[in-house]
UniProtKB/Swiss-Prot annotation:
Gene3D superfamilies: 3.30.420.40. The gene is tsaD. This is tRNA N6-adenosine threonylcarbamoyltransferase. Belongs to the KAE1 / TsaD family. It comes from Sinorhizobium medicae (strain WSM419) (Ensifer medicae). HAMAP family: TsaD.
């Protein structure tokens, strides 16, 4: 089967054609992503109105380009998959309405995909991973530990009670006068810094729960920078290195506990696996921490290519293919976008978790 995927949940406009064969193996036939970095960089973050307008201007052209790269026509497509949430509502409307129009015009089924499910299933596209497995999602809008049991079957083990990890990176960069996006800027600065100069806090470390908290770390960064004013480049490098060290130590505690829990509850799984997904997964220091943890606990560490960790339409197309192959029903043309859409509908909301970024 061939699926056309559309992604417009935040500040990337993307279209992709993905094939899934009868054995369940996937292949990306055509994939196009257009970043809006230049449009938002002057504001130090994503401006929803600008993002939505940029999606309108680019999406049609990107869909045509994805089909051309795949060497197929619309009539060769078996289904349409479009991100329906969570994310910025303006962008979601653009992508989902486009998907509906194509589905109506071609008579093909439409799958309104949860963006987080796209991340959760990417490892099956890239590494043919079998269920169940554990996923750490780290992005600008989410920091979650999720047990992936099957297509449409997810159990949230932990989440952030305040800032997402990507948000903490962006805010730290902004505090230090580093460019947007903040994640790569902080990582670059940290390479020449002393990670032990500042002993930043690690909230919730040692707690029996698997939840995260990063707002206190952000506050500590602000206080450190203020105490050094005017800060030098060396100070900034040391703050960034110490910031990353605090995050790595936090992940060792939270993720380490989750690996032990997975082994205890899924003892029959011969080769347990941890998947990392989301834009922050590009950070090499954090990848090294997770690889080390997996080595210690006997887990396979799966990190999809960086192009599939950040927002893309291939993962949306693949999620649609997985849902179609599993026999899950398509969505009606009256399906509505959802700015908030938890992957685990049974998970309880946490006190203090009201603000969660663009993709809450």
């Amino acid at each position: 089967m061939r699926i056309l995927g559309i992604e417009t949940s935040c500040d990337e406009t993307a279209a992709s054609v993905v094939m899934r064969d009868e054995e369940g193996r996937g292949r990306i036939l055509g994939d196009v992503v257009l970043s809006q970095l230049e449009e938002h960089s002057a504001y130090g973050g994503v401006v929803p109105e600008i993002a939505a307008r940029a999606h309108v201007e680019a999406l049609d052209t990107l869909i045509v380009e994805a089909l051309l790269r795949a060497g197929v026509k619309l009539e060769d497509i078996d289904a349409i998959a479009a991100t329906s949430g969570p994310g910025l509502i303006g962008g979601l409307i653009v992508g989902l309405m486009t998907g509906k129009a194509i589905a109506r015009a071609t008579g093909k089924p439409l799958y309104a995909v949860n963006h987080l499910e796209g991340h959760a299933l990417t490892a099956r596209l890239t590494d043919e991973l079998q269920f169940p497995y554990l996923m750490l999602l780290v992005s600008g809008g989410h920091t979650q530990l999720i047990l992936v049991k099957g297509v449409g079957e997810y159990e949230r083990w932990g989440t952030t009670i305040d800032d997402a990890l990507g948000e903490a990176f962006d805010k730290t960069a902004k505090l230090l006068g580093l460019p947007y996006p903040g994640g790569p800027a902080v990582e670059r600065a940290a390479r020449t810094g002393n990670p032990e100069r500042f002993d930043f806090p690690r909230p919730l470390v040692g707690d029996a729960r698997l939840d995260f908290s990063f707002s206190g770390l952000k506050t500590a960064v602000r206080q450190a920078a203020k105490s050094l004013e005017p800060v030098t480049e060396a100070d900034i490098a040391d703050i960034c290195a110490s910031f990353q060290r605090a995050i790595s130590r936090t992940l060792r505690d939270r993720v380490g506990r989750s690996l032990k829990r997975f082994k205890a509850e899924s003892a029959s799984v011969a080769q347990p696996a941890l998947v990392v997904a989301g834009g922050v997964a590009a950070n090499q220091a954090l990848r090294q921490t997770l690889q080390s943890l997996c080595d210690e606990h006997g887990f396979r560490f799966v990190a999809p290519p960086l192009s599939l960790c950040t927002d893309n339409a291939a993962m949306i197309a693949w999620a649609g293919a997985e849902r179609l192959a599993a026999g899950l029903p398509a969505d009606g043309l009256d399906v509505a976008p959802r700015s908030r859409w938890p992957l685990d509908a049974e998970a309880k909301a946490l006190i203090g978790s009201g603000r969660r970024g663009a993709k809450a």
